[in-house]
Design a protein with these regions (language model features):
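C-terminal beta-strand-rich structural cap/linker in extracellular carbohydrate-active enzymes
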Residues: 371-392
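Aromatic-lined carbohydrate-recognition surfaces of secreted/lumenal glycan-active proteins
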Residues: 108-124, 171-188
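Hydrophobic h-region of N-terminal signal peptides that target proteins for export
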Residues: 9-18
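Catalytic cores of secreted or luminal carbohydrate-active enzymes
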Residues: 264-313
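Aromatic-lined carbohydrate-binding/catalytic grooves of carbohydrate-active enzymes
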Residues: 38-41, 52, 56-155
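Structural recognition of the beta-strand scaffold that forms the well-ordered cores
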Residues: 30-35, 65-72, 109-114, 144-149, ...
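Carbohydrate-binding surface patches
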Residues: 269-272, 277-279, 315-354
């Protein structure tokens, strides 16, 4: 069967002109919650997912812009005699459609997970050879967002072809579904996925760690806030409305990051125009976690309709400066101290190509703080950020 599948995949280009993705979706980076970072495989069930939807509303996250509740791996257990995917009846006794209906009743959207290989990363049934059948099932269930992973693929399986096949299947099924590609940047999806999906992973998996050692050749290594962020450098040209680089889900609120590190993590993802997919337990958030995830000033930077991904303009002795052009001529600036020592800031804006005449708003302090006519001075503690909005 898999030989036939590969033959079918290899011929996808002849059909590409007759298929497309849902172009109107994800005009700004998707915002939501995914189960994996906190609950992994064993922790998910119908009760947990319903409670996450309730908490997204009650916590103010929905009002802040979060929309998607996404079940990651381990919701599926097999296929019936007709090949239809079967959900785990123990974990999800009410069924997936009823769960989707509940989430929709909250004014939220529902997402689910699959894999392009023979099995998912956790060894559950995947979609290889069942793309059109699964897409029809997702549409019937009321799915609004699909994450497709890249585990257990066949030798020689072609990533662009495989993901294009699922794109076509989703489009034919007729329900607008945001398509999230998750092949960890292994096949440089930024170079081919703009017309395939709405977002693509550009890094390996993240964890709740501030930094990871570089690879032997000096290149960044994923698995941390800074490692995943560094891997975004140079990819800004590929992001825009409807097609986003994805440095992986947020670890804000998960054990392992300090409050300062969580604030920096969130700030950097907003500067990168990254999808804001929370990965913590929404039912038990600290005040600090809630304040970070719902900060209206930072979310406005991420969701800016111009859709430009921010980029690094300076990196010197552990101090990094990022800029992000915004609609209407404003500019967001992020100052990051990635090092372990406090830094004293004292610079002229022209050092970073920014002219005079701009008013400055400190987005975390939520207050105006001068203009670019004078030197910027301040203190930046270890692993801290200052995020500023410059306006004409």
């Amino acid at each position: 069967m898999f030989r036939a599948v590969l033959v079918g995949i290899s011929g996808f280009l002849t059909l590409a002109s007759n298929a497309q993705k849902f172009e109107s979706l994800a005009q700004t980076p998707p915002m939501g919650w995914n189960s994996w970072n906190k609950f992994a495989c064993d922790g998910i069930n119908e009760k947990v997912i319903r409670e996450m939807a309730d908490a997204m509303v009650a916590s103010g996250m929905q009002q802040a812009g979060y929309r998607y509740i996404v079940i990651d791996d381990c919701w599926q257990v097999g296929r019936d005699s007709a090949g239809n995917i079967i959900a785990d009846a123990v974990k999800f006794p009410g069924g997936i459609r009823a769960l989707a209906d509940y989430i929709h009743s909250k004014g939220l959207k529902f997402g689910i997970y699959t894999c392009a290989g023979t099995k998912t990363c956790a060894g559950r049934p995947a979609s290889l050879g069942y793309e059109y059948q699964d897409a029809r099932q997702y549409a019937a269930w009321g799915v609004d967002y699909l994450k497709e992973d890249w585990c257990n693929t066949l030798k020689g399986q072609n990533a662009p072809a495989s993901y294009t096949l699922m794109r076509d299947a989703l489009y034919k099924a007729g329900r607008p579904i945001v398509f999230s590609l998750c092949e960890w940047g292994s096949n440089k999806p930024w170079s081919w996925a703009e017309d395939v999906g709405h977002l693509w992973r550009s890094t390996g998996d993240i964890s709740a760690v501030w930094n990871t050692p570089a690879n032997p050749d000096g290149s960044p290594r994923s698995g941390s806030v800074l490692g995943n962020m560094d891997l975004e450098n140079g990819l800004e040209q590929y992001a825009g409305p409807g097609h986003w680089n994805d440095p992986d889900m947020l670890e804000v609120g998960n054990e392992g990051l300090s409050v300062d590190e969580s604030r920096a993590h969130f700030s950097l993802w907003c500067m990168l125009a990254a999808p804001l997919i929370a990965g913590n337990d929404l039912r038990n958030m600290s005040d600090d976690t809630r304040a970070i995830l719902t900060n209206k000033n930072l979310i406005a930077i991420d969701q800016d309709p111009l859709g430009r991904q921010g980029y690094r303009v300076s990196m010197k002795e552990g101090l990094e400066v990022f800029v992000k052009p915004l609609q209407g001529g404003d500019t967001a600036v992020c100052l990051l101290n990635r090092g372990d020592q406090e830094k004293q800031l004292d610079f002229a804006w022209k050092e970073y190509g920014i002219g005079s005449g701009h008013s400055i708003k400190d987005l975390w302090k939520d207050r105006q703080t001068g203009t670019t006519d004078t030197r910027f001075r301040g203190t930046l503690g270890r692993h801290q950020v200052i995020v500023l909005r410059l306006s004409n």
